[in-house]
Amino acid sequence: MERIPSAQPPPTCLPKAPGLEPGDLPGMDFAHMYQVYKSRRGIKRSEDSKETYKLPHRLIEKKRRDRINECIAQLKDLLPEHLKLTTLGHLEKAVVLELTLKHVKALTNLIDQQQQKIIALQSGLQAGDLSGRNVEAGQEMFCSGFQTCAREVLQYLAKHENTRDLKSSQLVTHLHRVVSELLQGGTSRKPSDPAPKAMDFKEKPSSLAKGSEGPGKNCVPVIQRTFAHSSGEQSGSDTDTDSGYGGESEKSELRVEQPYFKSDHGRRFTMGERISAIKQESEEPPMKKSRMQLSDDEGPFTSTDLISSPFLGPHPHQPPFCLPFYLIPPSATAYLPMLEKCWYPTSVPVLYPGLNASAAALSSFMNPDKISAPLLMPQRLPSPLPSHPAIDSSALLQALKQIPPLNLETKD
């Protein structure tokens, strides 16, 4: 019979083969094959963790439900009473949540309205009218209302002359009546009426004061030139005008008064003629002239200075009295050019009006030593330019005698 080798035990004489270790086989690594095998201890631990997880999950769910119920109970307590009365019976959880949602929406709408009102107030608009009104429109409305109130007060006070008997209650009732008429749209009073006589009431005290004073009380006496007919008065008036008082402050007051003034003789003359008689001082200092300009103007005195100067200027209403050429004798015409340079700045001097001394004038031309003091021309202030030296009269006459006389024929 044949034996089955699997049923027979191995012979004991054969030695046991030693186990192979990884270090015995060089070049071969079996470390990656070790991970395939798992220990039974890890499997047992995972099963134990599942069993232990079920217990805390139940506790967590229980706690979560408890928190939900507690929050719903608090919402139920916080709901207003009018919302609780809308439902009958017990308030379920779903009903409490619905009422809470409704109440929150109402509060949100209210907050939105309040925000709009706050924005309107910050931008200067009225709470009821949020369309196109700006700050300027509000200011104009305030000013128009104030003007209307002031106009009514002034008109009411103007009707009652005796203000002592007037009471404040009467004025208040009058203003209330006017406001009611304006609100009703009465045609008798319109806010667009012309402004009242407010300015008239304000200007009445000042106008009355001016009227009581009269035109002459505001006038201050101004030092003016008085054209006298005698030499003594004329010499005394020269010192008055040189006092340095120019009357600058009175010019503005005189311009406010009447444009025409009456003189002592009843003649009317304008403001310009009256101011021309007042001494005026130029604001800018006079410009210095060179010698060439001085020779062109014929010495230190010019014809324009003599005409416009207050010393030799004629009366504004009387023509100047000039000495004609035919009154000068032929003998004087010979040395007349020298007299122009030495004594007289112009060939024809201007005399004061009303001077009844034609013969005296001729004698003064012939004899310069006998010229009276009032008829002498005033000298200007000393200028830096060199002036012509004065010549003695005796030396002048001797020099003139040596000059041959010119054959000049004059008219009758």
UniProtKB/Swiss-Prot annotation:
Domain bHLH: 52-107
Primary residence: cytoplasm
Superkingdom, natural source: Eukaryota
Covalent cross-link Glycyl lysine isopeptide (Lys-Gly) (interchain with G-Cter in SUMO2) as placed by the record, residue numbers: K167, K279, K288
Basic and acidic residues: bias regions: 248-257
Record keyword Zinc present: no
Keywords: Biological rhythms, Cytoplasm, DNA-binding, Isopeptide bond, Nucleus, Phosphoprotein, Repressor, Transcription, Transcription regulation, Ubl conjugation
Region (Essential for interaction with BMAL1, E-box binding and repressor activity against the CLOCK-BMAL1 heterodimer): 1-139
Keyword Phosphoprotein part of the UniProt annotation: yes
Entry-linked CDD domains: bHLH-O_DEC1
Orange domain sequence ranges: 142-175
GO terms, biological process: circadian regulation of gene expression; circadian rhythm; entrainment of circadian clock by photoperiod; negative regulation of DNA-templated transcription; regulation of circadian rhythm
Chain intervals for the UniProt region annotation (Necessary for interaction with RXRA and repressor activity against RXRA): 75-79
Recorded GO CC terms: cytoplasm; nuclear body; nucleus
Location in or out of the cell: Cytoplasm; Nucleus
Post-translational events: Ubiquitinated; which may lead to proteasomal degradation.
Gene Ontology molecular-function annotations: DNA-binding transcription repressor activity, RNA polymerase II-specific; E-box binding; MRF binding; protein domain specific binding; protein heterodimerization activity; protein homodimerization activity; RNA polymerase II-specific DNA-binding transcription factor binding
Record region (Disordered): 1-21, 182-257, 279-298
Modified residues (Phosphoserine): S235, S383
Covalent cross-link Glycyl lysine isopeptide (Lys-Gly) (interchain with G-Cter in SUMO1), where: K279
Record SUPFAM superfamilies: HLH, helix-loop-helix DNA-binding domain (SSF47459), Orange domain-like (SSF158457)
Cross-linked residues, Glycyl lysine isopeptide (Lys-Gly) (interchain with G-Cter in SUMO1, SUMO2 and SUMO3): K159, K279
Subunit record text: Homodimer. Heterodimer with BHLHE41/DEC2. Interacts with TCF3/E47. Interacts with ubiquitin-conjugating enzyme UBE2I/UBC9. Interacts with HDAC1, SUMO1, RXRA and BMAL1.
Chain's role: Transcriptional repressor involved in the regulation of the circadian rhythm by negatively regulating the activity of the clock genes and clock-controlled genes. Acts as the negative limb of a novel autoregulatory feedback loop (DEC loop) which differs from the one formed by the PER and CRY transcriptional repressors (PER/CRY loop). Both these loops are interlocked as it represses the expression of PER1/2 and in turn is repressed by PER1/2 and CRY1/2.
Name recorded for this polypeptide: Class E basic helix-loop-helix protein 40
Organism: Ovis aries (Sheep)
